[in-house]
Amino acid sequence: MFFSFYHSSFSSLSSFFFSFFSLLLYMLVLLQIFPKNYYEAGTLSIRVIRKNTFNHSYNNIKNIHYIHCGYPNIFNNCRNYYMNNFYNNNLSAPFKNKNNYMHIFFKIVEGNKKKKREHPFFKYLFHMNMLEKSGDKKNTVISKITESCQYGDIRKYMNMKKESLEEGEKNKSGEEYNKHVEQNNIKDEKIHFKDGTFIKSKEEEIENEKGGTICLKKEIQKNVLEINNNTYNNDTKYLSNPKGVTNKSKQSKKEIEKKKKKKNNNNNNNNNNKIKSEKSANDTKNIPPIPKNTEDRWNDYNKIKEYAKISNVYLGAHISASGGVQNAPINSFNISGLAFALFLKNQRKWESAALTNENIKQFEENCKKYNFDKNFILPHGSYLINLANPDKEKRDKSYLSFLDDIKRCEQLNIKLYNFHPGSTVGQCTVDEGIKNVADCINKVHKETNNVIIVLENSAGQKNSVGSKFEHLRDIINLVHDKDRIGVCLDTCHTFAAGYNIKTFENFDNVMKQFDDIVNVKYLKAVHLNDSKSDIGSGLDRHENIGKGKLTMDTFKYIMKSKYFKNIPIILETPDITNDESIYKYEIQNLYKLYFEK
C-alpha cells in the first residue's frame, strides 16, 4: 500500500517536474525566439478587395508584403499559412465576419496576456509604407520595432513602396498567383501586371456590398490605384513609426493645423490646375496642328503671303530659337508667319555663347529659303537689361548685355532690335531714368553701325519707364541719331497703362494722341496681344486673341488702320498648344478680320 502510494506520488511528482521543466524549457525557447517586448497591443490592417475576390488579393492588390525580421522558419510558416488560408477561403479566427469587410484585421496581442501565442507569425506581416504613417493614439499600432527587426531592411521595403514597385516585382507576383491557379485547379483565368495595371482576360461580374454588380477588373484596378496613390478608407489603421521616428500623434496642434492648411491649399491648387487644364483643352480643341507635309505648309504660307500683299500687314509671332538662331526662320515658316521675333541668346542669363559662323551662315540661308524680309525680323532684348537703373555698376552690366545683343543683330544683318527701357527701381526719378536710357542708346550707337533701337512701351508697373507716350518722346528727344531710334507698341501694355483701345473710335483717338506726342514716324513695330487684366491695371498679362479684356474691334483696327502698314506685327500670346500652332491659327483669323466689312 505504501509502495503503491509512493509510486503514485512519485509518478505524480515526476510528472509535475517533467511538465514544469518542459514548460520552463519551452518558455526559454520562446524567449529566445521572441525577444522581450516583442508583442504589443494593436491592429494591423491589410487592404484587400472583397470576399468574392479573396482568391486574387495577395497578387492583385500588391500592398501585402512580408518583412523577415530574423527568423526564416516562422517567416515562411507565416507566409504559407496566410497564402493557403487566403486562397482556399478558409480563414480562421482573425478573419471571422469576412463577408462585409473590405479590410482584414490581423490581431496582435500583448506578450503578457493569456493569448500571447495567438497567431504569432502575424507579427511578421507589414503593410509597406504603413510604418511612415501614424494616426491618433487610438489607431496607433506596433509603436516600436524590437532589436530583432532590422529597421534598415524595413526602410528599404518602405522606399520600394514609395517609389512604386518595380515592374519585375509585379510580374513576379503575377506569376506566383498563376502557379497557384494551376496547382489548385482553380477555375479562373490567369493574371499579370502590365505598366502597373492588373490585366485579366475575362471581366467577371461580382456582387458588391450594396447589392449591385461591379466589374472585377475595375474593382481591382481601383484598389491598386488607391494603394499606389496612398489613398485608403478612413477605417484603415496605420502602423506607427519605429522608435526614433517622430510620431504624428505627438506633434503639436499648431503643426497639425499647419499641415492640414497646407494640404487644403495643395488640393485647391490641384483643383485650379485641373480647371485650367480643362479650359486649355477646350481652348485648343478646334486649333488644327501644323501640317506634317512640307507641301501643305508651303500652300498655307503662300496664302498668307497673298493676304499680306493685299493688306500690307505683316503678321508673325515670337517663336522659338531653340537649337540655334538658324531655326527661327524655319519655325516662323511653319506657322505661316511673315514676320518674327526671337531671343538672340538666353534671355535670363548675363552671358551666353557667341554666335558661330555656322549659326550665321545657316540663318542667312534659311531666311532666303523661306523668303523672309529682314525688315520684318524683330529680336527681343534680354529680360535682365535695365538701362534706367541709377546704380552705375548695375547699369554698366546691363549695357554690356545690351551692346552684345545689338552686335549679334549686326552679325545676322538684322535691322531692328526691341527692348524694355527698364525701371528706376524706386531709387531715382523717372526723368533721371529716362536720361540713363538715352545715354546708353547714344553710347551704343557709337559702338555699332546701323541697327535701329526700338523702345517697347511698358504696362505701367511701379517705377517703370516707358508706360506713357511722354516717356517715349523724352527718350527719343535725348537720342542724338534719330534715324536709329523707334517705338514698338504693345497692345496689352498700352491698355494696361490706361489707354482705351477697345473700340475703333477709341483706338483711333489713342493713335492720334501717339502721333501728337511721339510722332507716328517712329512707330517701327507692334506686339499684338490681348490682355488678361483690365484697363489701367498696370499688369503685364498677355492673353490669346479674343480671350481677354480687349475686343475684336481692337484687332480689326490693327489690321485695317493706316498706322500699322509694312511693319512687323508680332504675336506674343500664350502658346497654349505647346507647339506654336496657336500662332498660325491666330494669324489666319486676323487676316480674316481684314476682309470683314
UniProtKB/Swiss-Prot annotation:
<keyword id="KW-0227">DNA damage</keyword>
<dbReference type="GO" id="GO:0003677">
    <property type="term" value="F:DNA binding"/>
</dbReference>
<dbReference type="GO" id="GO:0008081">
    <property type="term" value="F:phosphoric diester hydrolase activity"/>
</dbReference>
<feature type="binding site">
    <location>
        <position position="456"/>
    </location>
    <ligand>
        <name>Zn(2+) 2</name>
    </ligand>
</feature>
<keyword id="KW-0378">Hydrolase</keyword>
<comment type="function">
    <text>Plays a role in mitochondrial DNA base excision repair (BER) pathway induced by oxidative stress. Has apurinic/apyrimidinic (AP) endonuclease activity towards double-stranded DNA (dsDNA) with a preference for C as opposite base. Has 3'-phosphatase activity; removes 3'-phosphate from blunt-end, recessed, and gapped DNA templates and thus, removes 3'-blocks for DNA polymerase activity during BER. Lacks 3'-5' exonuclease activity and does not cleave damaged bases by nucleotide incision repair (NIR).</text>
</comment>
<dbReference type="GO" id="GO:0030145">
    <property type="term" value="F:manganese ion binding"/>
</dbReference>
<keyword id="KW-0496">Mitochondrion</keyword>
<feature type="binding site">
    <location>
        <position position="527"/>
    </location>
    <ligand>
        <name>Zn(2+) 2</name>
    </ligand>
</feature>
<keyword id="KW-0464">Manganese</keyword>
<keyword id="KW-0479">Metal-binding</keyword>
<feature type="binding site">
    <location>
        <position position="493"/>
    </location>
    <ligand>
        <name>Zn(2+) 3</name>
    </ligand>
</feature>
<dbReference type="GO" id="GO:0003906">
    <property type="term" value="F:DNA-(apurinic or apyrimidinic site) endonuclease activity"/>
</dbReference>
<dbReference type="Pfam" id="PF01261">
    <property type="entry name" value="AP_endonuc_2"/>
</dbReference>
<feature type="compositionally biased region" description="Polar residues">
    <location>
        <begin position="232"/>
        <end position="246"/>
    </location>
</feature>
<feature type="binding site">
    <location>
        <position position="542"/>
    </location>
    <ligand>
        <name>Mn(2+)</name>
    </ligand>
</feature>
<dbReference type="InterPro" id="IPR013022">
    <property type="entry name" value="Xyl_isomerase-like_TIM-brl"/>
</dbReference>
<keyword id="KW-0234">DNA repair</keyword>
<keyword id="KW-0540">Nuclease</keyword>
<feature type="region of interest" description="Disordered">
    <location>
        <begin position="232"/>
        <end position="296"/>
    </location>
</feature>
<feature type="binding site">
    <location>
        <position position="540"/>
    </location>
    <ligand>
        <name>Mn(2+)</name>
    </ligand>
</feature>
<comment type="similarity">
    <text>Belongs to the AP endonuclease 2 family.</text>
</comment>
<dbReference type="GO" id="GO:0008270">
    <property type="term" value="F:zinc ion binding"/>
</dbReference>
<feature type="binding site">
    <location>
        <position position="490"/>
    </location>
    <ligand>
        <name>Zn(2+) 2</name>
    </ligand>
</feature>
<feature type="binding site">
    <location>
        <position position="493"/>
    </location>
    <ligand>
        <name>Mn(2+)</name>
    </ligand>
</feature>
<feature type="binding site">
    <location>
        <position position="456"/>
    </location>
    <ligand>
        <name>Zn(2+) 1</name>
    </ligand>
</feature>
<feature type="binding site">
    <location>
        <position position="572"/>
    </location>
    <ligand>
        <name>Zn(2+) 2</name>
    </ligand>
</feature>
<dbReference type="GO" id="GO:0006284">
    <property type="term" value="P:base-excision repair"/>
</dbReference>
<feature type="binding site">
    <location>
        <position position="540"/>
    </location>
    <ligand>
        <name>Zn(2+) 3</name>
    </ligand>
</feature>
<dbReference type="GO" id="GO:0004519">
    <property type="term" value="F:endonuclease activity"/>
</dbReference>
<protein>
    <recommendedName>
        <fullName>Apurinic-apyrimidinic endonuclease 1</fullName>
        <ecNumber>3.1.21.-</ecNumber>
    </recommendedName>
</protein>
<dbReference type="InterPro" id="IPR001719">
    <property type="entry name" value="AP_endonuc_2"/>
</dbReference>
<feature type="binding site">
    <location>
        <position position="542"/>
    </location>
    <ligand>
        <name>Zn(2+) 3</name>
    </ligand>
</feature>
<keyword id="KW-0862">Zinc</keyword>
<dbReference type="InterPro" id="IPR036237">
    <property type="entry name" value="Xyl_isomerase-like_sf"/>
</dbReference>
<feature type="compositionally biased region" description="Low complexity">
    <location>
        <begin position="265"/>
        <end position="274"/>
    </location>
</feature>
<dbReference type="GO" id="GO:0140078">
    <property type="term" value="F:class I DNA-(apurinic or apyrimidinic site) endonuclease activity"/>
</dbReference>
<keyword id="KW-0255">Endonuclease</keyword>
<feature type="binding site">
    <location>
        <position position="420"/>
    </location>
    <ligand>
        <name>Zn(2+) 1</name>
    </ligand>
</feature>
<dbReference type="GO" id="GO:0005739">
    <property type="term" value="C:mitochondrion"/>
</dbReference>
<dbReference type="GO" id="GO:0005634">
    <property type="term" value="C:nucleus"/>
</dbReference>
<dbReference type="InterPro" id="IPR018246">
    <property type="entry name" value="AP_endonuc_F2_Zn_BS"/>
</dbReference>
